[in-house]
């Protein structure tokens, strides 16, 4: 099969796939060598970017996926009436602990958060952002939790190594809080001195 036809087949496979597709899966489905498919994926990615299309080809969670451009998110949201997945502060805390400490038990999560996390962990399991990765080899054999492929997809990561370090995360958090405080003060919100008065 010629290159033009193979590229069209790869594009069709990516379009029809419900999630990321590994290079090996694409090659198998297209009946082609992975070494021939990989450069065509790079070509498609470049073509979509240059053409200014409404979608891009991204590599994440060890696979390739066609996704809408981030700048078109508002219009895509209008199309879908269902609410996007939102995470509570408690869920984000538990998810951060799991992401950075995995594999981790629920008791470890409870200890680090200082409160019972059973409901939060169940919610994260239901959303498929975390998964059970095994059992700890201690009396009682508690379940061990880790992040899932859906976690990587949700946050647009290729792998866990793309997570910011704890130091970077702390700096980003401080910067975000500072910007939020400046915005509130500039918008006529309460300032630190007026709250203390």
From Swiss-Prot:
Keywords assigned by UniProt, alphabetized: Cell cycle, Cell division, Chromosome partition, Cytoplasm
Cellular localization per UniProt: Cytoplasm
Entry's Gene Ontology BP terms: cell division; chromosome separation; DNA replication
Cellular component terms (Gene Ontology): cytoplasm
Keyword presence, Cell division: yes
Pfam family, one: SMC_ScpB
Similarity annotation: Belongs to the ScpB family.
Binding partners and assembly: Homodimer. Homodimerization may be required to stabilize the binding of ScpA to the Smc head domains. Component of a cohesin-like complex composed of ScpA, ScpB and the Smc homodimer, in which ScpA and ScpB bind to the head domain of Smc. The presence of the three proteins is required for the association of the complex with DNA.
Physiological role: Participates in chromosomal partition during cell division. May act via the formation of a condensin-like complex containing Smc and ScpA that pull DNA away from mid-cell into both cell halves.
Protein name: Segregation and condensation protein B
Species of the source: Syntrophotalea carbinolica (strain DSM 2380 / NBRC 103641 / GraBd1)
Gene this protein is translated from: scpB
């Amino acid at each position: 099969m010629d290159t033009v036809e193979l590229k069209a087949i790869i594009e069709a496979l990516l379009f029809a796939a419900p999630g990321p597709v590994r290079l090996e899966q694409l090659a198998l489905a297209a009946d082609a060598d992975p070494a021939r498919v990989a450069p065509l994926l790079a070509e498609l990615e470049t073509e979509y970017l240059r053409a200014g299309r409404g979608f891009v080809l991204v590599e994440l969670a060890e696979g390739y996926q066609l996704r809408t451009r981030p700048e078109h998110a508002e219009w895509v949201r209008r199309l879908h009436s269902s609410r996007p997945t939102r995470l509570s502060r408690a869920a984000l805390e538990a998810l951060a602990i799991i992401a950075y400490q995995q594999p981790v038990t629920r008791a470890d999560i409870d200890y680090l958060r200082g409160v019972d996390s059973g409901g939060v962990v169940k919610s994260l399991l239901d959303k498929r952002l975390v998964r059970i990765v095994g059992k700890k080899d201690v009396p009682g054999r508690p379940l061990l939790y880790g992040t899932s492929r859906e976690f990587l997809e949700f946050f647009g990561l290729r792998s866990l190594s793309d997570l910011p370090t704890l130091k970077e995360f702390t700096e980003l958090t401080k910067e975000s809080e500072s910007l939020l405080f400046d915005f509130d003060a500039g918008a006529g919100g309460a300032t630190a001195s007026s709250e203390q008065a």
